[in-house]
């Protein structure tokens, strides 16, 4: 009889000696190899096989080189790997924080609306990652200074050629409802999600099995479906995306300990001192080389989470209804009685939610071989189409810099800098290690001449101005013969009346500020 019986639960498999040699099969993702040297009949007569004790009443199956492929092919469906379906995944992007760490860039804009990389906004990072991962059900939660963020989302993702199929992008703004509890704004990341759990009761969202929760202030390129697949494979209730980090930055993040099975066994939010040392781990067991492990002995939570929808609903409404933050409250508590898994992400990832990290990540883009770049044909980053002309330059010296569209550059020098859209640099300007966020509109030649004649300062940078290690926010007006170099290496300073702040030694010229002719900072 040529056919082979199917293996069922309770069935024991007897492997005939040498029967799998020269045969390659896949069973539960593993490969079995060998070569047939003896006929099956000799195996049945072998002393070892005859002396094997078989339990009476239990069906045994014999897998040989002749029936192995068919037998393994006909396994029950419970042994097959379940593929995660992006149609059953929704993304929640958190964009409602007050942005205190990015102040003054967030003085008039939500953190996800802050420009990055010359022509993008921070929100474009998770949005583009979702689109490239085929996740087309996206919710954006907003609260503080959301006008520019809402405007950018509308211009970029609502009907501008980006096809969401049967998906959507919904902006969920913080609202107040009747009653004492309803008067409160979002109290944290978990509280923000809790207030909108009702959206998953809608008919169009009832098939959502997993929810990924994303931050709006990170710089990285990630296929979220690989992350969700790991979540499904490990049968996790919650999965944390994690990145190895060195000791100098470890205390800035929530740190985790992960056992060899991938389960998160301990979570500590931004530990210091002895608590920080206790979170040190051998990262070689998570795929790092000994050299990499010595450099990065900590595992940080990226603030990217995947929840089973059912688990998220229960945690936020029943188990921990008064907990407001995922990182410091929900996740540490859930580790005790839920399957919380860790997903090690080895590619570039940077939290750019502070002035220092934001500045350094942007300036790093101008390196000859940057660790991260926006240029990728297969996974592009999307942003609002501005329909701007190419940049015009006149006898400029430009070294290792990024120049966005629609700029006018006089006879100037630009080194290791990023110039945002519609920027204007006059003759003799020298920029070094500077991030210029650009302008929202142009001023005509006659308008500029009129302003200069009246002793006023037009948008852009005036003649013979020298700037180093600076962030220039949108629509700033910097006069001629200005020097911004922070020669005294001041680390922190607030000069709002003069139009600038200093954070971590980086000078930040605020949006629409006017720096008068001859000013020295």
UniProtKB/Swiss-Prot annotation:
Pathway field: Glycan biosynthesis; starch biosynthesis
Subcellular location: Plastid, Chloroplast
Tissue note: Probably are expressed in roots, flowers and/or seeds.
Domain of life: Eukaryota
Regulation of activity: Activated by 3'phosphoglycerate, inhibited by orthophosphate. Allosteric regulation.
Transit peptide: 1-61
PROSITE patterns assigned: ADP_GLC_PYROPHOSPH_1 (PS00808), ADP_GLC_PYROPHOSPH_2 (PS00809), ADP_GLC_PYROPHOSPH_3 (PS00810)
Reaction(s) this enzyme catalyzes, per UniProt: alpha-D-glucose 1-phosphate + ATP + H(+) = ADP-alpha-D-glucose + diphosphate
Main location: plastid
Biological process annotations from GO: glycogen biosynthetic process; starch biosynthetic process
Annotated InterPro entries: ADP-Glc_PPase, ADP_Glu_pyroP_CS, NTP_transferase_dom, Nucleotide-diphossugar_trans, Trimer_LpxA-like_sf
Top EC group: transferase
EC number assigned by the record: 2.7.7.27
GO cellular component term, pick one: chloroplast
Keyword field: Allosteric enzyme, ATP-binding, Chloroplast, Nucleotide-binding, Nucleotidyltransferase, Plastid, Starch biosynthesis, Transferase, Transit peptide
An MF annotation (GO) of this entry: ATP binding
Family: Belongs to the bacterial/plant glucose-1-phosphate adenylyltransferase family.
Protein role: This protein plays a role in synthesis of starch. It catalyzes the synthesis of the activated glycosyl donor, ADP-glucose from Glc-1-P and ATP.
Assembly and binders: Heterotetramer.
Protein name per the record: Glucose-1-phosphate adenylyltransferase large subunit 3, chloroplastic
Organism from which the protein derives: Arabidopsis thaliana
